[in-house]
C-alpha cells in the first residue's frame, strides 16, 4: 500500500497539479480507497476491523511521514497503536453490540421554518435517539438567535447543540457573531472562516472560549491538519473520507489527533460519506483513542439507497458494519444509471 501511495502522491508530474491538494489529491484518494476496499474484502473484514487488527508496525509502514516528523514520528505512531491494543477486544465487542454515536443535521437547514425545525429537532432526538443536533447559522444574527433559542427549548438541556457557519465569516465578524451564542451551551461552532486560515481559526478559538471551534472537512492534506494542531486552532477536529488521499492519510490524521489530544467528529452527509467515514471513527475507537467520549459521526438521512450495505442507525448510534470492505459499493442499478459513458 505504501508503494501505491508513493506512486501517485509523489509522482513528479502529478505534483504540479497539487501538490497534495484539490481534485488531483481526491482522485488519488479514490484509487487508494478502492485498493483498501479490495484488501478488506480479501481478508473478509470490514475496513474498520482490518485497520484495527493490523499490527502497529505493519500499519505504520503504510503511512507517509514526509513533512510530519516535527509533529509525529513513526516510532510515536507505533507506540500509540501499541497502547491502543490494551482492551481492544472489549472495545470491538462493545462496538458490535452498541454502535458508535451519531448526530443529526436534519433539523438545521436555513430554509426551514421555525415550526419545521422544531418538529425535526424533537423527532431526531426524542424518537430517533440522537444526542446532538446541528443548525446552520450565519445569514442573519437575529434569525440565528431566535432559531437557537427555539431549538434549545425543543431538545432540552441534556442534548448537545452545535452550529455550522460553512466558512461564511471573516475573523472579526466570526468573533462578534459567535460571542452572542454563549447562552445556548453550544457543543461547537463549525467552519467559522476559511479552512485555509490556520491563524484565523486560532484567533477565533481563543476569543470565543469556552465555545469550541470545529473544522476539518475541507482540509486538503495531513500537512494542514498538522499546522492546525500545532497552533491549537480548534477544539474539535473533523475529517472527511474523500477530501484527502485515502485511508492512509486519514489514519495518520487520527494518530495526530491522539498525539495532540483532540477528539475527532467526522463530517458526513454527501452520497456515501456516512457509509465511508464511519469505518475510520470506529477504527479510532478500537485502536487509537480507545474512547467515544466527545466523539460522534455526523448523519444525514438521504442517498443511502444507492449502496449495497447502507448505513444503519439504531437509537442514535451508527451500527458497526460487518460486511467486508469499506462500505461504499454501489448497487448495480445505481452504477448502471449514473455510469459516465463518454
Regions found by a protein language model. Name each.
Residues 47-50, 188-192, 267-268, 291-294:
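Flexible, glycine/charged-enriched surface loops at secondary-structure junctions
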Residues 110-115, 126-129, 206-210, 286-294:
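Short, charged helix-to-loop "capping" segments that act as catalytic/coupling loops
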Residues 126, 134-275:
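Catalytic core of soluble alpha/beta enzymes
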Residues 28, 33, 186-187, 236, ...:
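Residue-level recognition of hydrophobic positions within alpha-helical transmembrane segments
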Residues 1-161, 166-175, 179-183, 303-342:
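N-terminal capping/lid subdomain adjacent to the active-site entrance of alpha/beta enzymes
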Residues 248, 252-256, 269-342:
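Flexible C-terminal active-site loop/helix
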Amino acid at each position: 500500500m505504501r508503494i501505491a501511495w508513493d506512486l501517485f502522491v509523489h509522482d513528479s508530474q502529478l505534483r504540479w497539479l497539487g501538490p497534495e491538494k484539490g481534485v488531483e489529491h481526491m482522485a488519488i484518494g479514490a484509487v487508494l480507497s478502492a485498493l483498501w476496499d479490495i484488501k478488506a474484502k480479501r481478508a473478509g473484514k470490514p475496513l474498520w476491523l482490518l485497520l484495527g487488527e493490523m499490527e502497529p508496525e505493519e500499519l505504520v509502514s503504510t503511512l507517509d511521514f514526509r513533512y510530519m516528523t516535527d509533529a509525529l514520528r513513526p516510532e510515536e505512531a507505533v507506540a500509540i497503536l501499541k497502547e491502543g491494543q490494551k482492551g481492544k477486544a472489549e472495545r470491538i465487542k462493545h462496538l458490535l453490540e452498541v454502535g458508535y454515536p451519531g448526530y443529526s443535521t436534519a433539523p438545521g437547514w436555513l430554509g426551514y421554518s421555525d415550526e419545521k425545525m422544531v418538529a425535526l429537532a424533537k423527532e431526531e432526538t426524542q424518537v430517533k435517539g440522537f444526542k446532538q443536533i446541528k443548525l446552520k447559522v450565519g445569514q442573519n444574527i437575529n434569525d440565528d438567535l431566535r432559531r437557537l433559542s427555539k431549538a434549545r427549548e425543543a431538545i432540552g438541556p441534556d442534548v448537545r447543540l452545535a452550529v455550522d457557519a460553512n466558512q461564511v465569516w471573516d475573523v472579526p465578524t466570526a468573533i462578534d457573531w459567535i460571542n452572542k451564542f454563549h447562552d445556548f451551551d453550544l457543543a461547537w461552532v463549525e467552519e467559522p472562516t476559511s479552512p485555509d486560515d490556520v491563524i484565523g481559526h486560532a484567533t477565533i478559538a481563543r476569543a470565543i472560549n469556552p465555545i469550541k471551534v470545529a473544522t476539518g472537512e475541507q482540509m486538503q492534506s495531513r500537512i494542514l491538519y498538522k499546522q492546525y494542531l500545532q497552533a491549537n486552532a480548534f477544539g474539535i477536529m473533523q475529517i472527511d473520507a474523500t477530501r484527502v488521499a485515502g485511508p492512509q492519510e486519514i489514519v495518520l490524521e487520527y494518530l495526530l489527533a491522539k498525539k495532540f489530544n483532540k477528539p475527532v467528529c467526522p463530517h458526513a452527509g454527501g452520497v456515501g460519506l456516512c457509509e465511508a467515514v464511519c469505518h475510520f471513527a470506529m477504527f479510532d475507537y478500537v485502536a487509537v483513542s480507545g474512547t467515544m467520549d466527545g466523539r460522534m459521526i455526523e448523519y444525514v438521512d438521504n442517498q443511502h439507497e444507492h449502496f449495497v450495505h447502507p448505513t444503519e442507525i439504531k437509537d442514535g448510534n451508527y451500527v458497526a458494519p460487518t460486511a467486508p470492505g469499506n462500505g461504499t459499493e454501489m448497487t448495480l442499478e445505481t452504477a448502471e444509471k449514473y455510469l459516465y459513458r463518454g
